[in-house]
């Protein structure tokens, strides 16, 4: 009977668990990486899309009441800065529901950025005074209402499944009380012998 090296076996199990956990984190950000197209799989992750058949982030979303189309994306791909944050927030707050009525409560808003933009985002929402002016204006974004979520899983990185993916400049506003992005773990990772 052969003795097993149990330390190595458990180390392999731990590494498999870490790999499975990372894959779940990676998969959770793929709607952002692939949100500007209607491709069904992004970086090896299958995405299910519902609604109007357009990309998740589109400038021409239709409303079910037949009203004017709406945009939840910049048509020019504006970079993150204080001024463009204000532009994005105004656009988000002026969105209408499918019946044409205003959105009543957005809740806390998260600014989701690739790690390359994290410093700028944290300066904009964390400074006590406005970071882009010299007149000591108050910074209206540092009241805790805006949360920064930064991750390397959004950045443009080569060597991922499917090649280079993500963007070093794309940023997103996510309102917690609006329609939530849903992550369904259809088949949890399991270990079998």
Summary of predicted features, one role per range:
Residues 1-40, 111:
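Long, contiguous amphipathic alpha-helices that act as assembly "spine/axial" helices in icosahedral shell
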Residues 3, 97-100:
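Catalytic micro-motifs at enzyme active sites that drive phosphoryl/nucleotidyl and oxygen chemistry
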Residues 24-66:
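Glycine-rich, mobile lid/loop segments that gate access to catalytic sites or pores
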Residues 51-98, 105-110, 115-193:
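Sequence/fold signature of self-assembling virion shell proteins
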